[in-house]
A protein has these predicted regions:
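Conserved beta-strand in the GNAT
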Residues: 75-79, 85-94, 104, 109, ...
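Conserved acetyl-CoA-binding loop-helix of GNAT-fold acetyltransferases
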Residues: 107-110, 116-129, 133, 138, ...
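Conserved catalytic-core motifs of GNAT/GCN5-like acyltransferases
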Residues: 142, 160-173, 325-335
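Conserved active-site alpha-helix within GNAT-family acetyltransferase domains
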Residues: 121, 145-163, 311-328
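Conserved GNAT acetyl-CoA-binding A-motif
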Residues: 131-142, 299-311
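Conserved N-terminal entry element of GNAT/NAT acetyltransferase domains
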Residues: 1-34, 38, 171-191
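Conserved beta-strand-loop-alpha-helix junction that forms the acyl-donor binding cleft
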Residues: 111, 141-150, 168-172, 306-317
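Active-site rim helix/loop that mediates acceptor-substrate recognition in acyltransferases
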Residues: 36-82, 86, 210-238
Length: 335
């Protein structure tokens, strides 16, 4: 894919400067809220609250000033400032992937009164230059699929789409109706581990493992892993959907692995993911996923909102049938 080289030297764009966490966190939070509040969820609101709270925490600011390049927090980046007001931002978040440095560009925002001037483009390129100067092996970003302007901008800068994933959410509900079915839901048996592992690796691929919180190894059955989860207070629940006629016929699995926060993550894997494209929504796999999602909504009735990350366009009807609603679809792009 072609890449457009844009001038981004400090003397050509004097409005651009590096993020100063000692004074910029609150105005950047205000800018992000202004630009993204219509699509912001509770986690996003909490993120902004944390930024504003951190901006008044001297101990945190002192620590963060020395850790900006080694922590997965948005403590590095570039802003566009005019008349002592921040009107543009691009954050840089460092990650490690198998020992290699990568960066996620996030929070690319331009004040509505200053758009169509190329500010977002220039800030994104400056962020890319920073990442390359740090010997990053990859630069990532994600963008909503309903933002064609931003998608084109990033494509013009050399980013290519790697994945497209939808986040689904539903509140636990003990009263949610459970339809009659020939599918049985049980705790996941160790004999299903090999099949579950294969499905999970296909559904949660390695190229996004640096960002996804799923620790697949923690799901492995056995005494050692059980002791690890016990001593680390690592709470996990796993279920399997099988045919009542043949209990050895695994149809789907579902894992609940809360990470803290206002939503709790669940991870689904179904047989359909390994079938040809034209057969992916097979009846048994789709019905099994629906039954598992209904089961977890009923079983975790006193828990926070459940959140499912799933490939966009896959099993849509099955997930909707369980009462989940799509929150957003993100396109993951890499340069």
């Amino acid at each position: 894919m072609s890449s457009i080289t844009l001038p981004a030297k400090a003397n050509e764009h004097p409005q651009v400067r590096t993020l100063n966490i000692l004074r910029d966190l609150s105005p950047v939070a205000d800018l992000i809220e202004l630009c993204f509040s219509p699509t912001m969820d509770q986690d996003g609101q909490r993120y902004l609250s944390d930024m504003r709270r951190a901006s008044h925490d001297d101990k945190f600011l002192s620590w963060a000033n020395h850790m900006a390049e080694s922590t997965s927090l948005p403590l590095t980046g570039y802003v566009w400032e005019e008349n002592n007001k921040i009107v543009g931002n691009a954050s840089l978040i460092p990650f490690r992937d198998q020992g290699k440095r990568i960066y996620l560009i996030a929070n690319v925002a331009t004040h509505p009164d200053h758009r169509r001037r190329g500010i977002g483009r220039i800030l994104t390129q400056r962020a890319m230059e920073h990442a390359r100067s740090k010997k990053a092996t990859a630069i990532w970003l994600h963008v909503r699929d309903d933002n064609p302007g931003a998608i084109k901008l990033y494509a013009d800068l050399g980013f290519q789409e790697i994945a497209r994933r939808t986040n689904w959410q539903a509140n636990p509900d003990l009263s949610f109706p459970k339809p009659a079915t020939d599918i049985e839901i049980n705790l996941r048996h160790p004999r299903f581990w090999a099949q579950q592992l294969d499905w999970l690796r296909r559904l949660y691929p390695d190229n996004l493992s640096w960002y996804q919180p799923l620790n697949i190894n923690a799901l492995k059955p056995g005494l050692i892993n059980w002791l690890y989860r016990l001593f680390m207070d690592f709470n996990i629940k796993q279920w399997a959907a099988v045919s009542k006629r043949d209990g050895e016929n695994l149809l789907a699995t579902l894992t609940w692995m809360p990470q803290g926060g206002r939503t709790e993550a669940i991870y689904a894997a179904t047989r359909s993911l390994v079938l040809p494209k034209e057969s992916r929504d097979d009846v048994s796999g789709a019905e099994a996923l629906t039954q598992l999602l209904i089961h977890v909504r009923r079983a975790l009735a006193n828990h926070p909102t459940l959140s499912l990350d799933y490939p966009a366009g896959e099993m849509t009807d099955a997930i909707l049938a369980a009462g989940f609603k799509p929150r957003r679809t993100l396109i993951w792009m890499r340069a």
